[in-house]
Amino acid sequence: MTEFIPLFAVRRNYGDVSGTRSVYLTFDDGPNPFCTPDVLDVLTQHRVPATFFVIGTYVANQPELIRRMVAEGHEVANHTMTHPDLSRCEPAEVHDEVLTASRAIRSACPQALPRHMRAPYGIWTQDVLATSAKAGLAAVHWSVDPRDWARPGVDRIVSSVLAAIRPGAIVLLHDGYPPGEERSCTDATSRDQTVRALSYLIPALQRRGFEIHPLPQLH
């Protein structure tokens, strides 16, 4: 029987670990050749870092985007190899999903050293946490989810984040789609709402006194 883990047992925010009003931008389900470059362009324009939780099968096809992420100061993190519901996987499958994804990341860019892992769909089990820990990966969930994947509109994405943001918050956004849904992301318009929202959101957060930082490395 699968032992599910309550969300309070998984990292959802970082409090105020730096003594500043820090917040953390994270992106799931890339890299995607149509969407990810636009996200990176906005981050570069505003000179802020982010963490990209990437899917290993996409990494193998888009190594240049992984190298660009690292070159521009972003963290590349583990979102498994094929984005399955890990609660339906045997322990050996969980192990393979996590470790193979980390290998794919390092193969694409040896300078990329994954330090964090996020379970697909945010479904955590004891096997997932144990495997992540053994692989040296900190398990990270999120505390702010504007559901940008559903394309609710740019204004809704921005307002949802600003209404929920707190010091230490981890914001969930998307720069791609999971395997099986990738046909939904065949041009730059697929995540255009996320990209446009991001261009408004970053200065709005900064005006409110928040600082955008990389996810902390916990020892």
Curated annotation (Swiss-Prot):
Domain NodB homology: 21-213
Binding site for a divalent metal cation: 79, 83
Cross-referenced InterPro entries: Glyco_hydro/deAcase_b/a-brl, NODB_dom, Nodulat_NodB, Polysacc_deacetylase_ArnD
Keyword Transcription: no
Metal-binding keyword on record: yes
UniProtKB keywords: Cytoplasm, Hydrolase, Metal-binding, Nodulation
UniProt-annotated catalytic positions: 28 (proton acceptor), 174 (proton donor)
Marked site (Raises pKa of active site His) residue numbers: 148
Protein name (database record): Chitooligosaccharide deacetylase
Organism listed in the record: Bradyrhizobium sp. (strain ANU 289)
Main location, first listed in the record: cytoplasm
Family: Belongs to the polysaccharide deacetylase family.
GO cellular component term, pick one: membrane
GO biological process, one term: carbohydrate metabolic process
Gene3D superfamilies, per the entry: Glycoside hydrolase/deacetylase (3.20.20.370)
